[in-house]
Each structure stands twice: as structure tokens, then as C-alpha cells.
Amino acid sequence: MRCFCCSISSYEHCCAPFISGTDSPQTAEQLMRSRFTAYAIKRYDYVRDTYSEEKRQGITSENLESSASGAHWFALKVHTSTHSEPSSDTVEFTAYYFENKYLFQLHETSCFIVEGGLWRYHDGILHDDCGKIKYGRNLPCLCGNNKKFKQCCATKVR
């Protein structure tokens, strides 16, 4: 099965080792992709645990689950991954999800830092194009599966 983060790798060889705790992301982009996957498969404990120590205060898995309830995350596009310093990177991405039968995008530039030798999500800047979007049903699916949107992820609308 292809990974939920839309990489070319299978889930087992991409994000699963990070989410299961058998391995740690070696780059900010790997962490960002695994956090997206954790949202997609509803592993909110992993999302919480990968916040920076400063930002993790007061965040619970239950809070994350409540804020994401109703969202079905299905596609991710990484635009840029910038390695500015050895202990901090930024990743610009767009994540796509369905909620209440509507299509949304989250376009963010995220800041990641290294704490105790591990990459952590610190914060992000949302871009102005976040929100509900229209996407042609006959266009290629956003997940990169080489099918038309209407024959691929659009069939998963709840």
C-alpha cells in the first residue's frame, strides 16, 4: 500500500517505522510527512509527541482528535524543504482533506527544530489560500495516483 503522505514508497517503508516508534525521522520533511500520515490514520498520540517541548504544553491526544474530527486527510504535496541551520528547517506543503463533503486545503510553511537529537514540529505560518476549494472531477487526483479525481479520492467523500 502506498504511503498516506503521497511519497512513492509504501507505508511500511515510509512513515510506519516513525509512527510505530521503531525509527525516528532523520529530516524535517520526513517528520512533516509522518505527522500528515498520523493525522490521516488518526494516530494523534504521535502528532502530540512530535511537537516541540515548548508547544506540546497543554496539548492532548483528545484535543487533537476533537479538532480533527470530521476531517479525512487524503493528499499531501511538499513544495519546498529548506535546510537553513543544522538544528532547524522549514517545510512548505499543502495538505488536502474532506470535511462535511467539501474539499479543503491547508497550505503551511512549518518550522521544525531538533530537540534531544530528534526533529520536532515547532510552529507554522498558514498561507492565504487555506480553506475550501473547488477541484475539477476530471483532473488528475491530488494524491498522485494517476487516476481522475472522480475515480480516486473523490469517491471517499463522507
What are these regions (language model features)?
Residues 1-9, 137-146, 154:
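Short Cys/His-rich zinc-binding micro-motifs
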Residues 68-105:
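Surface-exposed, charged secondary-structure patches
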Residues 49-78:
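Short solvent-exposed beta->alpha transition segments
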